[in-house]
């Protein structure tokens, strides 16, 4: 192995953040070393959620865990507390991911109150403490036993020799020792201190858990957690719930209220509109997670950290440390963002006006009610008349109103029991303000008593007022502060933590011991992993279930089993050059001229079409003016091109601009080009990406015909064309060029784990980006999906980069570059390589796809045509994957977030997108999971559905290239759903064969 001629450390030190070469080399080396481990981790991060979730609930769970797990929302079954159950599963996996998952005994994890069957079925190294505290716990144990039996019967070999690891003792009584623990909604019955004592009994150092959280519990008696659709209420006695009409004897004999009778405050969690089991827990235990910070117990000090609060679920961790703890002030805040728009209003709680209570009311409601009441206030009116005015205004600001046949909520509804008291408090508050203002006015002509009182010093005035208030309590509400209370949006807790636990903890020695132990355990795990990999590689390709919907572990296992074959470079068998250099240069020069003429033709066609529309609408080449018939003209063109639009000088568009669409250019009397917001102009679909004129002029900027070698690796679909690019890429000499932006983003993510970083955008660019922008020169170009490029475009890229070698990857039999204008005579678009190599082994396509593609090639290709698909083979484990079914309309298409949908035409794609919008599916689904066959070239998915919604003539279903792309996008299942019979449909003919 050759010795490196430069020092990486010196290179990075000298260039700093500009050392792209060193950064790219480190990324490349790291990727090669960790590729197999990352594949294993990706398999473990797939989470299947069977509960049926609405669009809003799906967004909640994707926002919380979508970046960490590969979520599969299968929408299989309705379940009570659907979102809460899904969050509980993801929360369990999230907490487990915080700890080592080696399977070694020293990495055992405890679960206080969790579901042991979940860990058993997933093979987690977890011991569950699942005590039977009541009938509900015993019911759960029985249900878990039956679920375990049902799953084992379906796949007994997977669970052979595996035993569930759990006990029915309380967490503090269990003797199993472990460094790590989790508690998923298990802290309600234990409290913060109870969890700390359980950790001490188990020798646990770190615990991570989750619980439902609402900061309003600190000051309210009831509230709602909207994301979980859960209502909570504090219960202080057996008679506090007025909705409960159970007889008194039944209440006193019930299990819940037998505890409540002991004057404990309980918190009941009820799920709204779900007549299911509720949960009742001790308020002191729940409050401890909000107020407590540390707890010292038997030589250990435990501290809690509140990590993430999202969707009404708080994730926290408790860490225990031994030895002495120096004094330290620990501070934390509990925030109440839900009350920022409210103000506290004191209302009478007794007729003698001595006892008052505080209620919350919207600041806007109080302000508007008081404003109108002040204007209508008249001291000569009876107090009842004033009261009626205030109640009328208050009712209007807190009731449902109807506008144009639509009901709207004005303000916020007020409790029926407090409604009149709130109005009375506002009346007193209004009268008090008038009196205060009157006193200020009377100060100019004050009496002798007023002058004497004003002459007193402030301490004497305060003392005098206090004596009067004490002797005459009914005068108390005559101060403003007794009516309006400013509600704080947070509560602060300060706690001084110190503990004398004896000797000081030697952190340095502990770190050395943990590091040594981890190295030893890592070697053991590496040896075990190597043995398993060797056994897997030695096994022949085995047959899986005949069910087309069975996903198993096929996609990722295929990557592991076939990893060795993918590392073999297809470049080793490239043939030598056989054509004359003069002939090659002439072909390339001709292709470059043709591509320049083609782009110029597209630009001229765009200008001609826009000019025709402009003139038909009444415009000309001299003035910016359109006549009244423009609506008829644009409505007619809109049926052909939905992107046709008019921009007026006021900034208004005739039709709403689709989301995400920007028109950089437009057309008016000054021609086609960039326009300002104050201009009148028209646009069409060609104005979204209008670079044809720039591309046509690039070839005149001293671009000479390249003389370097063009090598092409012509591989079948799924042969792993991206892997060789990653393996042979050298940042110092290479640049990766793709045909479109989507391919560039995929390569950047595969190579740099980022699609927009500086390094990724420097080394991976589209062909148009290279031609239109400044770029460094390189000696070698790596071209991905080269068949989508015009030959002249490839030659121009080589000339611009001054490359002496172009290594091109692509399938010559898939969809190639095609002219967007049928009137242009295209002759030199096909790539003419100097060296070629074939790759006939696919790692993506299942076994049954191979004969189907052969049959399609026999039917569609002319006789005597040589196709590499006549001898291609598959290394996939999946035996059967292709199914088909007839449907009556688009409403019968089963839209599932786990599947990828493709169509041959844009019309069918638009119909699917409309159907997805009707079903309220997320925007990401119909933006990313529905594509045309042309748009999906280069994409690989587990489950693919091809949809044909019309039986009218469509030549694309007769073309081998389009049908080939459609049938080779999947790794596990392919479903063809079609409406009616279409003559010459290749896919339908082979799917039924």
Swiss-Prot record:
Gene Ontology MF annotations: ATP binding; helicase activity; hydrolase activity, acting on acid anhydrides; mRNA methyltransferase activity; RNA binding
Q: Which GO terms fall under biological process for this protein?
A: methylation; mRNA modification; RNA processing
In terms of InterPro entries, this protein maps to: (+)RNA_virus_helicase_core_dom, 1a_necrotic_phenotyp-det_dom, Alphavirus-like_MT_dom, CMV_1a_C, P-loop_NTPase
Task: Please report the record's description of how this protein sits within the membrane.
Answer: Peripheral membrane protein
Q: Does the keyword Membrane apply?
A: yes
* Positions with a binding annotation for ATP: 715-722
**What family does this chain come from, according to its entry?**
Belongs to the bromoviridae replication protein 1a family.
> How is the subunit organization of this protein annotated in UniProt?
Interacts with RNA-directed RNA polymerase 2a. Interacts with Arabidopsis TIP1-1, TIP1-2, TIP1-3, TIP2-1, TIP2-2 and TIP2-3.
What is this protein's record name? Replication protein 1a
| Species assigned in the record | Cucumber mosaic virus (strain Y)
């Amino acid at each position: 192995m050759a010795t490196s001629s430069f020092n990486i450390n010196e290179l990075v030190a000298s260039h700093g953040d500009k050392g792209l070469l060193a950064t790219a080399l480190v990324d490349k080396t790291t990727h090669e070393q960790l590729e197999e481990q990352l594949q294993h981790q990706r398999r473990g991060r797939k989470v299947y959620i069977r509960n049926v979730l609405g669009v809003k609930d799906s967004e909640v769970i994707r926002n919380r865990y979508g970046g960490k797990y590969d979520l599969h929302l299968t929408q299989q079954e309705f379940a009570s507390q659907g979102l809460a159950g899904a969050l509980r599963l993801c929360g369990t996996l999230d907490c487990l991911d915080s700890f080592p998952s080696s399977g070694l005994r020293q990495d055992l994890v405890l679960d206080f109150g969790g579901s042991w069957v979940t860990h058993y079925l997933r093979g987690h190294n977890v011991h569950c403490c699942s005590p039977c505290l009541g009938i509900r716990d015993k019911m759960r144990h029985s249900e878990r036993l039956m679920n375990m039996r049902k799953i084992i019967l379906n796949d007994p070999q997977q669970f052979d020799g595996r035993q569930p690891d759990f006990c029915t003792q309380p967490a503090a009584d269990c003797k199993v020792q472990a460094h790590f623990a989790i508690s998923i909604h298990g802290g309600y019955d234990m409290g913060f201190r109870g969890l700390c004592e359980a950790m001490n009994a188990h020798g646990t150092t770190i615990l991570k858990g989750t619980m439902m959280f609402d900061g309003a519990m600190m000051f309210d008696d009831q509230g709602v957690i909207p994301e979980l659709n859960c209502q909570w209420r504090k219960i202080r006695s057996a008679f506090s719930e007025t909705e409960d009409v159970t007889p008194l004897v039944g209440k006193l004999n019930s299990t819940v209220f037998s505890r409540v009778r002991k004057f404990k405050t309980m918190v009941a969690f009820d799920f709204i509109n779900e007549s299911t089991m509720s949960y009742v827990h001790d308020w002191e235990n729940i409050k401890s997670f909000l107020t407590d910070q540390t707890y010292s117990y038997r030589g250990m000090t435990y501290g809690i950290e509140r990590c993430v609060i999202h969707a009404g679920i708080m994730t926290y961790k408790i860490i225990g440390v031994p030895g002495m703890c120096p004094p330290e002030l620990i501070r934390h805040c509990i925030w109440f963002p839900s009350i920022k728009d409210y103000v506290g209003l004191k209302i009478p709680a007794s007729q003698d006006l001595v006892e008052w209570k505080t209620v919350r009311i919207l600041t806007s409601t109080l302000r508007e009610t008081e404003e109108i009441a002040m204007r209508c206030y008249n001291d000569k009116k009876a107090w009842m008349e004033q009261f009626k005015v205030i109640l009328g205004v208050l009712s209007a600001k807190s009731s449902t109103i109807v506008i144009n046949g639509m009901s709207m909520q004005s303000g916020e509804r007020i409790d029926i029991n407090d409604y009149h008291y709130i109005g009375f408090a506002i009346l007193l508050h209004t009268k008090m303000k008038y009196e205060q203002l009157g006193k200020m006015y009377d100060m100019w002509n004050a009496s002798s008593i007023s002058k004497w009182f004003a002459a007193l010093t402030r301490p004497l005035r305060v003392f005098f007022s206090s004596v009067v208030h004490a002797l005459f309590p009914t005068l108390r509400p005559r101060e403003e502060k007794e009516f309006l209370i400013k509600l704080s949006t947070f509560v602060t807790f300060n706690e001084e933590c110190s503990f004398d636990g004896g000797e000081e903890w030697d952190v340095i020695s502990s770190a050395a011991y943990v590091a040594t132990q981890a190295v030893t355990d890592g070697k053991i795990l590496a040896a075990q992993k190597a043995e398993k990999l060797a056994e897997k590689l030695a096994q022949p390709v085995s047959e899986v279930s005949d069910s087309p919907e069975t996903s198993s572990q096929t996609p990722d296992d295929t990557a592991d089993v076939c990893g060795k074959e993918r590392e073999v470079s297809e470049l080793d068998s490239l043939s030598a050059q056989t054509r004359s250099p003069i002939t090659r240069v002439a072909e390339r020069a001709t292709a470059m001229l043709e591509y320049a003429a083609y782009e110029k033709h597209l630009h001229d066609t765009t200008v001609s079409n826009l000019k025709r529309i402009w003139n038909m609408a009444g415009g000309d080449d001299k003035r910016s003016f359109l006549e009244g018939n423009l609506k008829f003209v644009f409505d007619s063109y809109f049926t052909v091109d939905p992107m046709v639009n008019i921009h007026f000088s006021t900034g208004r568009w005739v039709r709403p601009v689709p989301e995400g669409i920007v028109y950089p250019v437009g057309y008016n009397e000054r021609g086609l080009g960039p326009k300002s917001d104050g201009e009148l102009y028209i646009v069409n679909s060609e104005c979204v990406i209008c670079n044809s004129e720039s591309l046509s002029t690039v070839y005149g900027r001293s671009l000479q015909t390249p003389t370097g070698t063009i090598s092409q690796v012509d591989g079948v679909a799924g042969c792993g064309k991206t892997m060789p690019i990653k393996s042979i890429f050298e940042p110092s000499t290479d640049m990766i060029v793709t045909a479109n932006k989507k391919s560039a983003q995929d390569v950047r993510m595969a190579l740099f784990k980022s699609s927009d970083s500086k390094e990724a955008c420097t080394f991976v660019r589209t062909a148009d980006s290279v031609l239109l922008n400044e770029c460094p020169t390189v000696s070698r170009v790596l071209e991905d999906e080269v068949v989508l490029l015009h030959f002249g475009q490839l030659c121009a890229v080589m000339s611009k980069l001054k490359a002496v070698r172009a290594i091109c990857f692509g399938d010559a039999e898939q969809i190639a570059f095609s002219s967007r204008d049928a009137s242009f005579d295209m002759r030199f678009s096909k790539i003419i390589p100097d060296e070629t190599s074939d790759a006939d082994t696919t790692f993506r396509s299942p076994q049954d796809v191979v004969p189907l593609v052969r049959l399609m090639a026999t039917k569609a290709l002319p006789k005597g045509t040589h196709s590499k698909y006549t001898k291609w083979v598959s290394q996939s484990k999946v035996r059967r994957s292709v199914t088909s079914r007839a449907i009556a309309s688009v409403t019968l298409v089963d839209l599932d977030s786990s599947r990828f949908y493709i169509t041959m035409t844009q019309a069918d794609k638009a119909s699917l997108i409309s159907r997805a919008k009707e079903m309220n599916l997320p925007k990401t689904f119909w933006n990313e999971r529905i594509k045309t066959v042309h748009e999906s070239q280069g994409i690989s998915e587990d489950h693919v559905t091809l949809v044909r919604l019309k039986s009218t003539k469509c030549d694309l279903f007769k073309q081998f290239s389009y049908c080939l792309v459609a049938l080779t996008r999947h790794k596990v299942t392919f479903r063809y759903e079609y409406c009616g019979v279409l003559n010459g449909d290749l896919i339908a003919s082979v799917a039924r064969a």
